[in-house]
């Protein structure tokens, strides 16, 4: 088995794809900045270290998720993220 690595936003977001015991996922890092992500599948995003400030589809307010916290994003939508410190995350896809 091999791992697939990806880079987005000029290398400011990097991830490594893997197959967990239950769902496919990625483990990644984000540099300081603001990003808009598109989803292809339902996502469970957990902050491993650092923090992500997120504006989910249909939301009017931003919400900050810290280490150990998880948010969910529907498939086939876009969501916005602000990163104030380099942050590690785990994303599982359903």
Swiss-Prot record:
InterPro entries, per the entry: Ppnp (IPR009664), RmlC-like_jellyroll (IPR014710), RmlC_Cupin_sf (IPR011051)
Domain of life: Bacteria
EC number(s) on file: 2.4.2.1, 2.4.2.2
UniProt catalytic activity: a purine D-ribonucleoside + phosphate = a purine nucleobase + alpha-D-ribose 1-phosphate; adenosine + phosphate = alpha-D-ribose 1-phosphate + adenine; cytidine + phosphate = cytosine + alpha-D-ribose 1-phosphate; guanosine + phosphate = alpha-D-ribose 1-phosphate + guanine
Keyword Hydrolase: no
GO cellular component: cytosol
An annotated Gene Ontology molecular function: purine-nucleoside phosphorylase activity
Pfam families reported in the protein's UniProt record: Ppnp
Family statement: Belongs to the nucleoside phosphorylase PpnP family.
Job description of the protein: Catalyzes the phosphorolysis of diverse nucleosides, yielding D-ribose 1-phosphate and the respective free bases. Can use uridine, adenosine, guanosine, cytidine, thymidine, inosine and xanthosine as substrates. Also catalyzes the reverse reactions.
Full protein name: Pyrimidine/purine nucleoside phosphorylase
Species of origin: Psychromonas ingrahamii (strain DSM 17664 / CCUG 51855 / 37)
